[in-house]
Amino acid sequence: MDDPFSTLAPRRGTQPLLSNWATIGISELHGGALGWGSWWSNLSRLGSSFGSNLKNLGLKAWNSSTGQALRQHLKDTNLQHKVVEGLSTGIHGAVDIARQEVDRQLAKRLENYEPPRVASTEETVDDVKTVALPSKEDESERVLVTKIREPPPPYDAVFGPAPSAETNKKQKFEETLQNAGLVSSPPAPIAAPAAIAVPAQTTMSHPASSRRRHHWQGTLDSIMGLGLQPIKRRRCF
């Protein structure tokens, strides 16, 4: 929105008092002579140049005679090995200190530990109570006779006497005669007369009364009304 803030300024008639700074507050304002983009580019350029200059100085110092002498002295004194040994010694020392602390805590707990008290045999014997066991009754007295199993009946009493050879021959002879038609077969049993089913008595149901059948009509008449019903009475004056 390019409407300047001068529209909010006090006016003298139609002329605003800030007419000389009418461009204040619009999109054409770029900060005057100060450009933030140039500042950022200058800072980034300065940082990159500073880093490259520092790198070049370090390489020159490392490759110089002083740097070579320093490296040779470090190699002669075996500084790298000493640093590694110092680090390993410090690590082992820290581990030893931790182990000593753990051992100290364990020893302290063992000193404060009290073993459980074991009761002596005499006390245990005194604490034991003698309990009288009930006398064992005779096992024969506890046996309850619930059922007496009788011996099975003999074969002859159930199936009858075993047929002899003569009876078998007689039965076979009678069967052959029956097959030949010489001996009449016994008459078939006469079936008993079947019971005649007597029909049940049916009762005639009378139709419902017209009043009950037309119950809704009676309800309608009571709602609508039938007028006054005349009543004839004889009176003597």
Curated annotation (Swiss-Prot):
Region (Binds to importin alpha/beta, involved in hexon nuclear import): 227-237
Record has Ubl conjugation as a keyword: yes
Short motif Nuclear localization signal, span: 232-235
One GO CC term, this protein: host cell
GO biological process, one term: lysis of host organelle involved in viral entry into host cell
Pfam families: MCPVI
Superkingdom of this protein's organism: Viruses
Sites annotated Cleavage: G32, A33, L226, G227
InterPro entries attached to this UniProt entry: McpVI
Additional observations: All late proteins expressed from the major late promoter are produced by alternative splicing and alternative polyadenylation of the same gene giving rise to non-overlapping ORFs. A leader sequence is present in the N-terminus of all these mRNAs and is recognized by the viral shutoff protein to provide expression although conventional translation via ribosome scanning from the cap has been shut off in the host cell.
UniProt protein name: Pre-protein VI
Source organism: Murine adenovirus A serotype 1 (MAdV-1)
High-level lineage: Viruses, Varidnaviria, Bamfordvirae, Preplasmiviricota, Tectiliviricetes
